[in-house]
UniProtKB/Swiss-Prot annotation:
The keyword NADP does not apply. Heterodimerizes with OPG040. The heterodimer OPG185-OPG040 interacts with components of the entry fusion complex OPG143 and OPG094. Heterodimer with C3/VPC protein; disulfide-linked. It holds the Pfam family V-set. Residues 1-16 form the signal peptide. Residues 304-315 are intravirion. The chain crosses the membrane at residues 280-303. This is Protein OPG185. Induction: Expressed in the early phase of the viral replicative cycle. Disulfide bonds join 34-103. PROSITE patterns: IG_LIKE.
Length: 315
């Protein structure tokens, strides 16, 4: 007979009704509610807590008391007193809000004079989805170019006078507090495998010849830069003139330009503090008191001797 209660307990655990689940996303609001089965008794108090040991609120009549750093801004209690349903709303869900929430009813019979309180509780599981999906749209664009053929004969190509102009930008030297410079060099080549035909079409060889740098086609411009240095004694502006030829040489050489240093001096003025005056006053007062004490002692001794001398003369 002792095995029967154990068997019934195991059966109730196996076939118990699972807790309802609510699934929400991060940032959403979740509304949790539960109904009580005992509709005849009088509700004394209802409560909500989160497993394992976190009390959210206690509600009695029109008063709601929050615990464990929960506030009405985070969790609102939306149930009228002594209703069959108790409801809370969790706002702006985060990953920490996920878990099992339990509601409880504390009830008493209105016709019973005893202090017996019945208890019912129901649980619901809140799932907060933290997985986010993102879609990346990649658009690829391009064009194909098929080389055009020319009907020109090799001997005709050699007789043509062809020229091409190219514009190449050399790398910019790295400088501090100097305006950006771009050295533009124009090159002219008398021998290149590009032919201009009468029809406007062009034919390009697959392996063009290297382009040589010619010094006579360089275009040199002068650049004036201003460097402003702010110090505690004022603002110093330095004007410097730099031409692109010098910049080109600076880029190719490993020489560095020495920087200009602007120095300034700061004069510190010390003021006497209240503490210093107190110390001076204390020392002066001590000297005066010492002098007064010495005077009093001397006067006392002198007066005592005078009285003694007068007494001896009277006798």
């Amino acid at each position: 007979m002792a095995r029967l209660p154990i068997l019934l307990l195991l059966i109730s655990l196996v076939y118990s009704t699972p807790s309802p689940q609510t699934s929400k996303k991060i940032g959403d609001d979740a509304t949790l509610s539960c109904n009580r089965n005992n509709t005849n008794d009088y509700v004394v108090m209802s409560a909500w807590y989160k497993e394992p040991n976190s009390i959210i609120l206690l509600a009695a009549k029109s008063d709601v008391l929050y615990f464990d750093n929960y506030t009405k801004d985070k969790i609102s209690y939306d149930s009228p007193y002594d209703d069959l349903v108790t409801t809370i709303t969790i706002k702006s869900l985060t990953a920490r809000d996920a878990g099992t929430y339990v509601c409880a009813f504390f009830m008493t019979s209105p016709t019973n004079d005893t202090d017996k309180v019945d208890y019912e509780e129901y649980s619901t599981e809140l799932i907060v989805n933290t997985d986010s999906e993102s879609t990346i749209d990649i658009i690829l664009s391009g064009s194909t170019h098929s080389p055009e053929t020319s009907s020109e004969k090799p001997e005709d190509i050699d007789n043509l006078n062809c020229s091409s102009v190219f514009e190449i930008a050399t790398p910019e030297p790295i400088t501090d507090n100097v305006e950006d410079h771009t050295d533009t060099v124009t090159y002219t080549s008398d021998s290149i495998n590009t032919v201009s035909a009468s029809s406007g079409e062009s034919t390009t060889d697959e392996t063009p010849e290297p382009i040589t740098d010619k010094e006579e086609d360089h275009t040199v411009t002068d650049t004036v830069s201003y460097t402003t240095v702010s110090t505690s004694s004022g603002i110093v502006t330095t004007k410097s003139t730099t031409d692109d030829a010098d910049l080109y040489d600076t880029y190719n050489d490993n020489d560095t330009v020495p920087s200009t240093t602007v120095g300034c001096s700061t004069t510190s003025i010390s003021n006497y503090k209240t503490k210093d005056f107190v110390e001076i006053f204390g020392i002066t007062a001590l000297i005066i008191l010492s002098a007064v004490a010495i005077f009093c002692i001397t006067y006392y001794i002198y007066n005592k001797r005078s009285r003694k001398y007068k007494t001896e003369n009277k006798v």
